[in-house]
Amino acid sequence: IDDASLNQIVDNIQSRLEELGKEKGVTFDVSYDNCNADASVMEQIISDFQADKVDLMVGVATPVAMRMQSATEESDTPVVFSAVSDPVGSGLVDSLDAPGANITGTSDYLDTSSIMKLIQAQNPDVKKIGLLYDVGQDSSTTAIQEAKDYLDKEGIEYVERTGTTTDEVQLAADALIADGVDAVFTPTDNTIMTAELSIYEKFIDAGIPHYTGADSFALNGAFVGYGVDYANLGQKTADMIADILIDNADPSKTAVETFDNGTATVNTETCKALGLDFDTVKKAFEPLCTQVNEITTAESFDEVESK
């Protein structure tokens, strides 16, 4: 899928491999393709990789990683996944410490309860939270259930709305606004991420802050993105690739790399449009975060860096 977080991961994998190649005196021949969430295109891309007899496959995000795993079960081709939220729950690995098969990688597991606490810190009187996600995204399943469990314990009402396409997500956003929610939560859901630029103004106009599981959502207009550093995740993925290809590390015995959550990225334009003061928001968030970053709305991180 063409979204800011996944593009950032790919860019950092490639740049880190170039760096490692120079350090180790080797050249990594990288073939890159993007199926844009089209299952038939994904099948063809993986088939082409197999026909080219690649030494290793890299699957960015859960659906691609799962298909690569099944496609390579009868071969010796290792798979390294990147940005898989729940590697065990999705069946990719037996455990995080010992994957058990010819696959390992990096996880962007989301600490959902921490985002719920951010919502409460910003609005202690919150009474109803909207849960916006794609029911078909494996990466969302665990996080949404964790959100429900947390909100049940806190006695906070929630309403779920889902969508599998941008058009459906827009309708789901409209429904949440009509539901009168005080805030909206979305985990690391690629479908919603792809649609964020088309819905963030709806939430702003309704005065509803959108809390999300990645900084790329905030880049595309959401109020807050919270979670892991995807640039670092991409670099660590490249390190694992090099360990396997150069140092003969065994994927089945190579622990899945996990990362600390804790970085909250606030879109200052959205913050202002919602009638909130950034300094006040930052002060409320800081006890719950390792750092609070600022960002403004753009389509890609490259645009932000070039400003």
Please report, for each region that a protein language model flagged, where it lies by residue.
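Extracytoplasmic "Venus flytrap"
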Residues: I1-L20, S31-S40, G136-S140, D189-T194
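Short beta-strand segments enriched in small/hydrophobic residues
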Residues: I1-L6, K127-D134, V184
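An alpha-beta-alpha
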Residues: I13, T104-E154, T254-T270
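Short beta-strand elements in bilobed, periplasmic/extracellular small-molecule ligand-binding domains
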Residues: E19-M42, N102-I103, K148-T166
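Beta-alpha junction/loop-to-helix N-cap segments that form part of ligand/metal-binding clefts
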Residues: S31-D94, D189-I204, I208-G213
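Hydrophobic alpha-helical segments within soluble ligand-binding/sensing domains
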Residues: D86-K128, V228-A249
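Pocket-lining segment of extracytoplasmic ligand-binding domains
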Residues: D138-H210, A214
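Hinge/cleft segment of the Venus flytrap/periplasmic-binding protein
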Residues: D243-K307
